[in-house]
Amino acid sequence: MRSERPNLFFHAIDAFGGFEPRGDGAPGISIKVLSSDLDTDRKRGSRTRLLRLNPGTSTPEAHAHDYWEEIYMLEGEMTVHEDGQVKTVGPHTYAARKPGVMHGPVSSKTGCLMIDFCWYESGEDK
């Protein structure tokens, strides 16, 4: 399957403005999509986005995705429940999650900014 994502050459990204509330209505969490052809109905494609948690944000419960997810923390701190542990992570930390892996809830006293990569494996990749 050929990607629908456009070719993007290096360009400046505003890491402060232009964020939108996350689609599920989670308060205090906003996103800026950098590139995406992720189609959760057809279970294909990929997405790259910035994800911001405002200071004092917390999510109520654990969740899982049916796609791969990689997160790299750029700034701030976040407390996350994962793999039976509670961890506080900061800048230059990284997570990679296979489809179906439970994670969360999360919270951030200071606020944080992450880059989030999500994708479905194609039939040829499995």
PLM-predicted stretches and their roles:
Residues M1-G45:
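A short, N-terminal "cap"/entry segment at the start of jelly-roll beta-barrel domains
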Residues L50, E70, A96-R97, K109-K126:
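A short hydrophobic beta-strand segment most commonly corresponding to one strand
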Residues D83-G100:
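Short acidic-glycine-tyrosine-enriched beta hairpin
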Residues I29, R44-T48, D66-W68, M73, ...:
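Short connector loops at helix/strand junctions that flank enzyme active sites
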Residues K32-H65, K98-M102:
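Conserved short histidine dyad/triad with adjacent acidic residue
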Residues P55, A64-D83:
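Glycine- and acidic-residue-biased ligand/ion/polar-headgroup-sensing regions
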